């Protein structure tokens, strides 16, 4: 199972059920369980990371706030944003947490290069940036030597809700999205992202599914 990957395309989903399913998957996986990546668009929601502070929620209005157990601070998820959850056995891949973060940042940087978008990571604030404007947020959790949670890449969405928070705890952090820089569809970006992931983490066999994880 070391070099096998299952990619689940889950479509549009509320945040909490997917978060709970990640927990169930991670709790029940063992050394023979293949790694999975879940691709999803969430209905509008603010999620607070473990380091999140209430003062970074400025005016959430009618958008719900969920306290999550990922790393990092507050962010926004909504339609038109590609969320990728990485359910990876780090011990099997011989990866440390910092290495995985770097791999994920590089994954996004390489994906954006396909669309002639130059981007970079920042040592002081995880994620990916285009000229100091944030295009991708990142937050992970590790349990039993396995990762869950992942990245949120802004593709073609309403960025206004980010003005209701201090994104990732940074007041005035400007957000940007792929469609501001290059016309593209969610499906195109998903395809490139998975191709880059397979190359970066050396997966040899990839299977796709549209079924949600069912632990029963």
From Swiss-Prot:
Q: PROSITE patterns from the entry? A: BPL_LPL_CATALYTIC, LIPB
Q: Which residues form the BPL/LPL catalytic domain?
A: 31-205
Q: Which Pfam families match?
A: LplA-B_cat
Q: What is its main location?
A: cytoplasm
This molecule's function is given as:
Catalyzes the transfer of endogenously produced octanoic acid from octanoyl-acyl-carrier-protein onto the lipoyl domains of lipoate-dependent enzymes. Lipoyl-ACP can also act as a substrate although octanoyl-ACP is likely to be the physiological substrate.
In the Enzyme Commission scheme, what number(s) does this protein have?
2.3.1.181
Protein name per its UniProtKB record: Octanoyltransferase
Biological process (GO) annotations held by this record are: protein modification process
Q: Which family does it belong to?
A: Belongs to the LipB family.
What Gene Ontology terms describe what this protein does at the molecular function level?
A: lipoyl(octanoyl) transferase activity
Keyword Nucleotidyltransferase among UniProt keywords: no
Question: Where are the residues marked Lowers pKa of active site Cys as a site?
Answer: 134
């Amino acid at each position: 199972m070391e070099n096998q990957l299952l990619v689940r395309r889950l479509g549009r989903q509320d945040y909490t059920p997917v978060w709970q399913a990640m927990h169930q998957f991670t709790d029940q996986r063992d050394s023979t369980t293949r790694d999975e990546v879940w691709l999803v668009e969430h209905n509008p929601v603010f999620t607070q990371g473990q380091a999140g502070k209430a003062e970074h929620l400025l005016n959430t209005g009618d958008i719900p706030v969920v306290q999550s157990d990922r790393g990092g601070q507050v962010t926004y998820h909504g339609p038109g944003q590609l969320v990728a959850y990485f359910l990876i056995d780090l011990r099997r891949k011989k990866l440390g947490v910092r290495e995985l973060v770097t791999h994920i940042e590089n994954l996004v940087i390489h994906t954006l290069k396909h669309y002639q978008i130059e981007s970079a990571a920042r040592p002081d604030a995880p994620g990916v940036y285009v000229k100091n404007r944030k295009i991708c947020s990142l937050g992970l959790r590790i349990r039993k030597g396995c990762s869950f949670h992942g990245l949120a890449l802004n593709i073609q969405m309403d960025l206004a809700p980010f003005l209701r928070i201090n994104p990732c705890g940074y007041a005035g952090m400007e957000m940007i999205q792929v469609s501001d820089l290059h016309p593209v569809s969610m499906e195109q970006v998903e395809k490139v992202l998975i191709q880059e992931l397979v190359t970066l983490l050396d997966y040899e066999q990839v299977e796709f599914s549209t079924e949600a994880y069912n632990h029963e």
